[in-house]
């Protein structure tokens, strides 16, 4: 009994240490107005769809150059698309990024595209991290932090988080990291 309790405690600590969440940020950076907390019926329907795994939810956000990027345009052109939710201030995101870069380098020629969705609030922090971490794939951010439209649509509660979407629009993987990500991509992109 003590061993089971100990293992559950260790697992909880490990989960806490390996992801960033809204509560991890300073309270003043995480406040929302009543307007921001209100969602329209289309957003509610989309979030319900994501929760039921009925397929991916399309969204459009500004890219690094300020031009709007639509997820469906990227999904339709690739065998597999990984939507990677991250932020420059997130230590676990930075620790995971070499694995994501390796996956991109190993599988991009086989049909993988990655779309980075940053939960940063400052454009300079976001773009400096993209360069520093060698993230050579499309990047998006509305610079709204945890209030990001995409994060809300996909119920992102902690980062790093990811969603794998095949060309048919089906979600075929979630929150895969390191070797698990590499193995799943190898399986899907034979």
What residue spans do the PLM features occupy?
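N-terminal "domain-start" segment that seeds a small globular fold
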Residues: 33-76
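C-terminal motif of bacterial Sec signal peptides marking the signal peptidase cleavage site
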Residues: 17-19
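Short, internal strand/loop/helix patches
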Residues: 127-168
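Thiol-/selenol-based redox modules, centered on thioredoxin-like
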Residues: 164-190
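Bacterial N-terminal signal peptides that target proteins for export
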Residues: 1-8
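Short active-site neighborhood of thiol/selenol oxidoreductases, capturing the structured segment around
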Residues: 71-91, 100
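Bacterial lipoprotein signal-peptidase II cleavage site
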Residues: 21-29
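Structural microenvironment flanking redox-active thiols in thiol-disulfide oxidoreductases
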Residues: 95-133, 145-151
């Amino acid at each position: 009994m003590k061993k089971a309790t100990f293992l559950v405690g260790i697992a909880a600590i490990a989960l806490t240490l390996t992801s960033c969440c809204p509560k991890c940020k300073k309270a003043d950076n995480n406040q929302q107005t009543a307007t921001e907390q209100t969602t329209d019926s289309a957003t509610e329907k989309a979030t319900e769809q994501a929760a039921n795994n009925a397929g991916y939810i399309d969204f459009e956000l500004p890219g690094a150059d300020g031009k709007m990027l639509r997820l469906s345009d990227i999904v339709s052109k690739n065998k597999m698309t990984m939507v990677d939710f991250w932020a420059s201030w997130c230590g676990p995101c930075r620790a995971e990024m070499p694995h994501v870069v390796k996956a991109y380098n190993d599988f991009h020629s086989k049909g993988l595209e990655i779309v980075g969705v940053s939960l940063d609030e400052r454009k300079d922090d976001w773009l400096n991290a993209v360069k520093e971490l060698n993230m050579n794939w499309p990047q998006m951010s509305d610079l709204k932090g945890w209030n990001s439209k995409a994060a809300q649509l996909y119920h992102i509660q902690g980062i790093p988080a990811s969603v794998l979407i095949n060309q048919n629009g089906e979600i075929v993987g979630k929150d895969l990291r390191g070797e698990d990500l590499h193995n799943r991509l190898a399986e899907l992109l034979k």
